[in-house]
From Swiss-Prot:
SUPFAM superfamilies on file: Acyl-CoA N-acyltransferases (Nat) (SSF55729), Chromo domain-like (SSF54160)
Biological process per Gene Ontology, one example term: positive regulation of regulatory T cell differentiation
EC number from the UniProt entry: 2.3.1.48, 2.3.1.-
Post-translational modification: Phosphorylated on Ser-86 and Ser-90; enhanced during G2/M phase. The phosphorylated form has a higher activity. Phosphorylation at Ser-90 by CDK1 or CDK9 is a prerequisite for phosphorylation at Ser-86 by GSK3. Phosphorylation at Ser-86 by GSK3 (GSK3A or GSK3B) activates acetyltransferase and acyltransferase activities. Phosphorylation at Ser-90 by CDK9 promotes KAT5 recruitment to chromatin. Phosphorylation by VRK1 following DNA damage promotes KAT5 association with chromatin and histone acetyltransferase activity.
Family the UniProt entry places it in: Belongs to the MYST (SAS/MOZ) family.
Lineage: Eukaryota, Metazoa, Chordata, Craniata, Vertebrata
Protein name: Histone acetyltransferase KAT5
Catalytic residue positions: E351 (proton donor/acceptor)
Keyword Manganese applies: no
Summary of activators and inhibitors of this protein: Acyltransferase and acetyltransferase activities are activated by phosphorylation and autoacetylation. Autoacetylation activates the histone acetyltransferase activity.
Biased composition (Basic and acidic residues): 90-100
Gene: KAT5
Length: 461
């Protein structure tokens, strides 16, 4: 059995952790770093095939030294600080880009052919049929719900102009480790999931204090209290373009409010692993969702979008802060992004790759929105109601490729007597109705006060 002193960076061994059911388990983990505090060694571990947000510092008592695997010196991959350059099998290291090609045996309905209701052996409660059209290639999201990343096509070169861009080239030993222990934001204390490039001198602090209105950071509670006596903001900068009840949205220009935008990106990076932070926020707009009480407008989440997108992206980054997750706010952010696209008269899609949580939220939103349209179709003169994929896209502002991939994901497309039938089974309908009963938060278009700008005519934004 190995000794504690023999453990080095790059070793792999089982590590004790508690799972979601509060049961002990011993998953395989990799040692990313070792540090000594007052003669006591601590080991920073990444659990193989688990999300990086679960990485943590552990003591030697949680390590199974009998099954340790030392790094191989003859590894062909270049190493850095004793670590292999890649981790096959770790989902956050492998950017999964799945492309499902529809073969002649599994055709997709034409975008413009009308659809109509069609019964199927009495088992279907509602059905929509589309006339056969040309076969097309469909770029679909992957179907693994635990996947960290997803794409709808061949990856393009990383953009180097945004505030948060998709790029793994800086994924080294430093950025693989969480560097902020805890963040105090208003009445919440947040435990970061990932690395964020805050100034080095702040990474040794037990708590990083943020002003919840301007997002400036301080070293201590005293610094924050001193700042609050001078900060007169009680809401994000920019224009309030939506308010209903306690929920508001503020539109923030990344050029006009550069400091706030950069601070927002630093905070967001603590909870987004698939993006690399850059400081050029000028080409971006930020839409911050807040919850109002007597003390002000408290940030709940946000999404950003490019002022000019050549690829129809209506979201660049999207995040609901951890204290507000699993409460319907993520779907509300997504719904708001499509509401803006409707006002702009465009269809939109989120920038890929999506995080695992983002992918789940988008799949759920697309499914509910499309099913809502299909189930609301009315028949005329006793005939089956008809609709095309283009019409679904125009009504919802969801890009056609996302409409098709969602229909495939829900397994609604069937070929029957020369027609493409979209069949809604009892299970699909019942599941949708149950989900909609739980979806209490919705965007009210009448409460939106938004005038889109033509950024192509505004020079350098």
């Amino acid at each position: 059995m190995a000794e504690v002193g023999e453990i080095i960076e790059g070793c792999r061994l089982p590590v004790l952790r508690r799972n979601q059911d509060n049961e002990d388990e011993w998953p395989l983990a990799e040692i990313l770093s070792v540090k000594d505090i007052s003669g006591r060694k601590l080991f920073y571990v990444h659990y193989i095939d688990f999300n990086k947000r679960l990485d943590e510092w552990v003591t030697h008592e949680r390590l199974d030294l009998k099954k340790i695997q030392f790094p191989k010196k003859e590894a062909k991959t270049p190493t850095k600080n004793g670590l292999p350059g890649s981790r096959p099998g770790s989902p956050e290291r492998e950017v999964k880009r799945k492309v499902e090609v529809v073969s002649p045996a599994t055709p997709v309905p034409s975008e413009t052919a009308p659809a109509s209701v069609f019964p199927q052996n009495g088992a279907a409660r509602r059905a929509v049929a589309a006339q056969p059209g040309r076969k097309r290639k469909s770029n679909c999201l992957g179907t693994d719900e635990d996947s960290q990343d997803s794409s709808d096509g061949i990856p393009s070169a990383p953009r180097m102009t945004g505030s948060l861009v998709s790029d793994r080239s800086h994924d080294d030993i430093v950025t693989r480790m969480k560097n902020i222990e805890c963040i105090e934001l208003g009445r919440h204390r947040l435990k970061p999931w990932y690395f964020s490039p805050y100034p080095q001198e702040l990474t040794t602090l037990p708590v990083l204090y943020l002003c919840e209105f301007c997002l400036k950071y301080g070293r201590s509670l005293k610094c924050l209290q001193r700042h609050l006596t001078k900060c007169d903001l009680r809401h994000p900068p920019g224009n309030e373009i939506y308010r209903k009840g306690t929920i508001s949205f503020f539109e923030i220009d990344g050029r006009k409010n550069k400091s706030y935008s950069q601070n927002l990106c630093l905070l967001a990076k603590c909870f987004l692993d698939h993006k690399t932070l850059y400081y050029d926020t000028d080409p971006f707009l930020f839409y911050v969702m807040t919850e109002y009480d007597c003390k002000g407008f408290h940030i709940v989440g946000y999404f950003s979008k490019e002022k000019e997108s050549t690829e129809d992206y209506n979201v660049a980054c999207i995040l609901t802060l951890p204290p507000y997750q699993r409460r319907g706010y993520g779907k509300l952010l997504i719904e708001f992004s499509y509401e803006l696209s409707k006002v702009e008269g465009k269809t939109g899609t989120p920038e890929k790759p999506l995080s695992d949580l983002g992918l789940l939220s988008y799949r759920s939103y697309w499914s509910q929105t499309i099913l809502e349209i299909l189930m609301g179709l009315k028949s005329e003169s006793g005939e089956r109601p008809q609709i095309t994929i283009n019409e679904i896209s125009e009504i919802t502002s969801i890009k056609k490729e996302d409409v098709i991939s969602t229909l495939q994901y829900l397994n609604l497309i069937n070929y029957y007597k020369g027609q493409y039938i979209l069949t809604l089974s009892e299970d699909i309908v019942d599941g949708h109705e149950r989900a909609m009963l739980k979806r209490l938060l919705r965007i009210d278009s009448k409460c939106l006060h938004f005038t889109p700008k033509d950024w192509s005519k505004r020079g350098k934004w």
